[in-house]
Amino acid sequence: MSEPVRKLTFAEADARDDADALLGHEWLVTNGLGGFASSTVACVPTRRYHGLLVSALPTPLGRTVMLNHISEWVRLPNGARFQIGGQERAGGVLEMPGAHYLAEFRLEEGLPVWRYEVDGAVVEKRVLMLHGQNTVHVNYHLAEGDGPVRLKLRPALQFRPLEEAVHDSINEPYTITAVEDRLELCTGHTYPPLRLKIYGLRATFALDGGKLQNVYYRTEDRRGYPHVGELWSPGYFSVDVTEETSATLVGSTEEWELIRALSPEDAQAAEHERRERLLAAADPKARRGVGGELVLAADQFVITPSGRQQDAARAHAAGEEVRSVIAGYHWFTDWGRDTMISLEGLTCTTGRFREAGWILRTFGQYIRDGLIPNMFPDGSNEGLYHTADATLWFFHALDRYLKATDDRVTLEVLLPKMHDIVKCHLEGTRFGIHVDPKDGLLVQGAEGYQLTWMDAKCNGWVVTPRRGKAVEINALWYNALKLLKGWTREARGEASARDLDAHAERCRRSFNERFWYEEGGYLYDVVESWEKHGENDSACRPNQLFAISLEHAVLERPRWDSVLEVAREKLLTPVGLRSLSPDHPDFKPTYHGDLQTRDAAYHQGTVWAWLIGPFVDAWLKVHPEDRAGARRFLEGFVPHLDEACVGSISEVFDAVEPFTPRGCIAQAWSVAEVLRCWVLTSEQAGR
């Protein structure tokens, strides 16, 4: 994997001058804490979330944009100067001189490298973050040509919570402490200082502070948010690079002692070794090629959450660590549902079994009234519990983990909690979640809450409430009962599992009686829908696939083929499944615009990449010998690795061609499910 596995070439003049292409491609580097560095390939920030250092800070701060970008100039020995990178100003002023010199952008072991060519000189830039630290290294090297080449590096910043809109003015002054090759920047706020240090020949810093006004963030504009901001720069660093010596600018919110603990060379070697270990631990079918890329992409989502001291103390007392899963970059935090759906692909397929166990046990500590948290808000220690399915996915995730590890200790720890979950669902718990005693089916619904994975809500408007008896909720409920029955019988004997068996059988019988939509040849999405005044909702959605794809399929076998064929015909695309059939009157073909417009389309046609997972599982249940056919459903994701976030998989796509990627540029369950299915459909290692 040391060779570049993903490369974008900009040798042609038209490619370099295509602003949309350069600004539409993004990159992401993470630090294992939820912090990250990310921007466009052109190094022009277009989102409020873009930054060279977004630190994951302890509660109550959460993730914070600390360093926005660096403006870079190169001076050759002959005196010629050129700028790489750029910025965009309000009023349509796009300054992107570096595009004319950008010959190539590539990923090496998942880390970004830029290659700039000018007047016979080739300068390469690399970005990495130290794992487990809020520290970024930006490295420059003269790959070809005569040296020394002099670099001028001007950092631009505005300390701001990740989710906060960009500011058109900076009210708080920054104070500067400069000592030789290092700089410390502070505000009167509770933010930690931003510490900058330069490594290299003849390194200097010039105090030349000033504001950068009217900075335009085009993606924020398109998404309906404030989009003109102001940044501040303390001055600029100057440093020489040659073919023998590189230069590195370090930005960090850590203490100086930790920042200086590793030289840039040692940091790069350590990260290279860490990534090699990740690949070596993964399933042999996922160590090279597309599989290897996805293993490295998967690593970006597995984190040690910052600030949860109680979690850490509890885990450390047991000789363990705390782990969670970031649902997507840039804006999602750790979500229970996304974590449980992603767990197999992110951890079991990649050989990270210990971390999988830590994740399950961490969420097990947060069970309240038979529910695991739906999500943890940024900068908070407390979870929110408005979900009807995350807890049922917990059973699925535990099952996949046990099949991979046979970890009976974790099962013993969690088994009482799983019984308590079922008890709470049978008796009724929060948000109207309860089993209907008349038919054994699970009901969910509470006014003003979005409880299934189709959870868009804007200004109090729940777009797809799906209150009643939802198809995937009951498929998951049946699966949970059957799994718990098996675990209980193994641990406590047959007699202890009889009640669970009875509940499962009643659910199965009622499901097959109530959910079959004869006219369409598929399953109702919701039975006794509150939105349809007790009638059944016949919207054709991908949720029905879980009645086939889960370990214990609740749908009777003779109906599998029909459901699968309808899903293939109406919902399947090259990059996942539509969330609603195009023949439905509420179908929305594209996902764009302001928040309300986007939310109206979020689950009303928009394609979701992660849904390829249950489709492939269902396909292989119906066609167990046709792995090649199942692999074809994944091939559309390969060219997508060159789009949006290079080397990763987007959250959603438009529902019609050309299936433009939208939403989060890197989504945990998208990567996890494609990786899991890539391995599942591989005939040999490394395909």
Stretches with model-predicted labels:
Residues 1-687:
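Acidic, mature catalytic/reactive cores of soluble proteins
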